């Protein structure tokens, strides 16, 4: 039995879940999300909890049991609390600006890099060097944060670049030089 898959998911107040066959719709104060389940997994709501169960003990059913339990739990957390990723920009003259759904990054290239955020994703810039990506879908928030980081990943010699707030960048020593 999957240790993750067998845990029931608590359903917070103001969050409703609608299960129609293999289709799930979760609505909450921050928005709504939908998910189609594979045939190996079923979802049942019992009072204030949601349980994900597998149909049989085949290998694919066992693999997907824990995965879809986590996906449903992330949907419930997303519509009730939301998700956010914070990125720090380090480097002389490196900065970011946000205008509506557009993020402009000045990170050492000849022209600024402009990125347009998809619908449902909010981007904010705090003191020109910290970018906050937030939304209700954990997968999209993580992908957008990874794309922003990919514009200028941190380099190991001086540490310049865009990094996650909790990321540790291993530093390297430069060339030894002549003696």
UniProtKB/Swiss-Prot annotation:
**One Pfam family, short name:** Ribosomal_L6
Name the coiled-coil region(s).
none
Q: Which GO terms describe its biological process?
A: cytoplasmic translation
Q: Name the domain of life.
A: Bacteria
Q: Which UniProt keywords apply?
A: Ribonucleoprotein, Ribosomal protein, RNA-binding, rRNA-binding
A GO cellular component entry from the record: cytosolic large ribosomal subunit
Gene Ontology molecular functions: rRNA binding; structural constituent of ribosome
State the SUPFAM superfamilies in the record. Ribosomal protein L6
- Could you confirm whether the keyword Ribosomal protein appears in this record? yes
Fetch the InterPro entries from UniProt.
Ribosomal_uL6-like, Ribosomal_uL6-like_a/b-dom_sf, Ribosomal_uL6_a/b-dom, Ribosomal_uL6_bac-type, Ribosomal_uL6_CS
Q: Which PROSITE patterns match?
A: RIBOSOMAL_L6_1 (PS00525)
Please name every pair of cysteines joined by a disulfide bond in this record: none
Q: Report the protein's function.
A: This protein binds to the 23S rRNA, and is important in its secondary structure. It is located near the subunit interface in the base of the L7/L12 stalk, and near the tRNA binding site of the peptidyltransferase center.
Give the family, as the similarity comment puts it. Answer: Belongs to the universal ribosomal protein uL6 family.
NCBIfam families found in the cross-reference section: L6_bact
Q: Can you state the subunit structure given in the record?
A: Part of the 50S ribosomal subunit.
Put simply, this protein is called Large ribosomal subunit protein uL6
Q: Which organism is it from?
A: Crocosphaera subtropica (strain ATCC 51142 / BH68) (Cyanothece sp. (strain ATCC 51142))
